Regions:
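Iron-sulfur-cluster electron-transfer modules
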Residues: 1-74, 208-389, 523-558
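Ferredoxin-type iron-sulfur electron-transfer modules and their immediate structural context
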Residues: 1-3, 46-58, 66, 82, ...
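Conserved hydrophobic helix-helix packing surfaces used for dimerization/oligomerization
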Residues: 3-4, 111, 304, 413-416
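Iron-sulfur (Fe-S) cluster-binding segments and ferredoxin-like electron-carrier domains
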Residues: 161-171, 199-218, 246-264, 351-352, ...
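Immediate flanking context of iron-sulfur cluster ligation sites
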Residues: 177-195, 227-241, 331-338, 363, ...
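Local cysteine-cluster metal-coordination motifs and their immediate loop/turn environment
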Residues: 187-206, 236-251, 309-312, 338-350, ...
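Short, flexible loop segments at boundaries between secondary-structure elements
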Residues: 392-412, 450-453, 502-538
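Long, compositionally biased charged/polar accessory segments in the mid-to-C-terminal portions
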Residues: 444-449, 464-479, 504, 509, ...
Length: 558
């Protein structure tokens, strides 16, 4: 095994000796001093009596061969027989060696020493670490300047928010610090850590891990062939909202990582259907039994089609009905209706085949209507339909700004806290349009702590509530933290989650059309509301009989 020898007492050689011993090199430290206490006093005269005693005791406990009272002659150094040799400046001068290399600290014959002009405690420790790297290279028979990596001061990529940091005066170093001065200087350290994503993301806070660690564990989870997939809960409870990407100075995208993991595990049969089963069946219900696609009476093709979204029909069917009536009355060229789900549920679940089938169904229905301009009442639907390439899609808020508020709309709604939807993240046009519409309603808007592109997810996105209800509740609590009064949103999922969280919650269409939805409906009531909206539209507008077809079986009660 390679051995090391260190000659002469100075702070640099003391630290090098500890560094080499820490690397498991059998190390001898030759000094002229007679004891560990005397050695520490020579190397670190700035220490107090108690400090010197403590360091001497620590030195005695190290796996280090201390040779006291040594005659530090050139003959001793040259005859030590060690593979790695490091010397103090005094011994370096006695050996008559040239100035050590500025990078590797190597002199002739591979002897390590600190260069001239290198003063101070920090520099001694820095040079000792560099000497340790050179020692490793020499022990391995490599060039000491090979593969050293970054050394010394570098520009950090770490982002640190200094908005809450309290600046303080530095303590002059002089000949060293007293314990009180050292404590005062150390107290100025703000413990630099970039936690921008964790500050905003309830999911990361729930699991208490940084994105890099989560990514590694998710990767390992996906790669498991047999055994328990312990990270499935974390993968499925990410809201896929994209807030972390906006908050991260480097744009790290946990949503894409979790969605890719879901897709991969679905494709390889490793993801249980159970966690998303009800949500997927709910999508199928919306696109079968509760589905409706019709042109406006009197038209075969339409200029527009209203797409309220599956949650609007489930949570606020009256607002959806009145919105359609208003659009029909004020838009030329015919306004069709399309009741159904945009398919984002299957997209979030990683069921890409089902998502493509949903897009194909919607595309075929839109073609029957003449590929009209889609009016979406949900920002997530708007985003999903646009990205799926299903045609021109605009938000109902944009049209209402063009047309003006409907007759009878309120103009003094009072104070509200406006929450931005995850589906509008990065969509400044929609965010601005909703605010302008709210102002026309007489709303005095208060912004929550996280707003616009940095808004918190309500807990509905990504099917988090189906996978981990407790994590979804964390999302909701975080979004409502510090918010008072009416919580105004333009996403029905947000409206529902905030109401379930105990807040007074309203969707902007409820205000515009004076159609408050009341308490959040349960699962069965949501399905009933979708069917009722479909039947009401068929009955009132298309004059069709909406009686339920008789069942082919008889129910007997016992």
């Amino acid at each position: 095994k390679k051995t090391a020898a260190v000659f002469g007492a100075e702070l640099f050689t003391l630290v090098v000796a500890g560094e080499l011993a820490g690397k498991s090199y059998p190390t001898k430290f030759y000094v002229a001093e007679r004891s560990a206490e005397e050695l520490i006093e020579t190397c670190a005269p700035f220490l107090s009596t108690e400090g010197r005693a403590a360091e001497a005791k620590r030195l005695d406990g190290m796996d280090l061969g201390l040779v006291f009272g040594a005659q530090l002659t050139p003959e001793l150094v040259r005859g030590c027989g060690a593979d790695i040799v490091c010397v103090s400046r005094a011994v370096h001068g006695a050996l008559g060696l040239g100035e050590p290399d500025g990078l590797t600290l190597c002199c002739e014959g591979g002897v390590l020493a600190q260069g001239r002009g290198a003063e101070g405690v920090i520099r001694a420790f820095y040079d000792a670490r560099r000497a340790g790297v050179s020692a490793d290279r020499l022990a391995q028979g490599m060039s000491p300047d090979n593969a050293r990596g970054e050394e010394g001061p570098v520009e950090s990529r770490l982002y640190t928010d200094l908005s809450e940091a309290v600046p303080g005066p530095s303590v002059p170093e002089g000949g060293g610090y007293s314990p009180e001065q050292a404590a005062a200087e150390a107290a100025r350290c703000i413990q630099c850590r970039c936690e921008e994503c964790i500050k905003g993301c309830a999911w990361l806070r729930h699991y208490g891990k940084f994105p890099r660690i989560m990514t590694r564990e998710i990767y390992n989870n996906v790669g498991i062939i047999m055994g328990d997939h312990m990270m499935n809960g974390a993968i499925n409870s990410c809201a896929l909202c994209g807030q972390c990407t906006v908050n991260c100075p480097n744009g790290y995208d946990m949503a894409e990582i979790c969605l890719s993991a879901r897709r991969n595990m679905v494709a390889t049969g490793k993801m249980s259907l159970a966690v998303h089963e009800f949500a997927l069946y709910d999508q199928l219900f919306s696109n079968t039994e509760a589905f409706l696609c019709r042109p406006e009476p009197g038209y075969e093709k339409c200029a527009y089609v209203f797409f309220p979204g599956c949650q609007a029909g489930a949570i606020a069917p009256e607002a959806a009905y009145r919105a359609y009536e208003d659009l029909r009355a004020r838009l030329p060229g015919g306004v069709g209706i399309l009741l159904g789900c945009c398919g984002v549920i299957s997209h979030w679940a990683g069921r890409e085949e089902l998502f493509e089938e949903t897009c194909a169904q919607l595309r075929a229905e839109l073609e029957k209507l003449g590929n009209p301009r889609i009016i979406a009442a949900c920002p997530t639907c708007q985003k999903t339909l646009r990205e799926a390439g299903l045609g021109e899609c605009t938000g109902i808020w944009d049209l209402l700004l063009e047309l003006g508020l409907p007759e009878g709309a309120p103009v003094s709604c009072g104070e509200v806290t406006l929450h931005d939807a995850c589906g509008a993240r990065g969509d400044a046009h929609t965010q601005k349009a909703v605010r302008e519409l709210a102002e026309r309603l007489g709303c005095k808007i208060t912004e929550p702590g996280h707003t616009l592109d940095r808004s918190d997810c309500c807990g509905w996105g990504g099917l988090a509530a189906f996978a981990k209800p407790e994590v979804a509740e964390d999302y909701t609590r975080a979004a409502l933290d510090g918010c008072e009064g009416v919580q105004l949103s333009y996403c029905m999922g947000c409206r529902d989650r905030y109401a379930r969280g105990g807040a007074e919650s309203a969707h902007i269409l409820e205000l515009i059309y004076s159609a408050p939805a009341g308490s959040p409906p349960g699962i069965s009531e949501k399905r009933k509301n979708r069917l009722s909206l479909k039947q009401r539209l068929l009955r009132d507008i298309w004059k069709e009989d909406t009686h339920m077809a008789p069942r082919g079986y008889k129910i007997e009660y016992t």
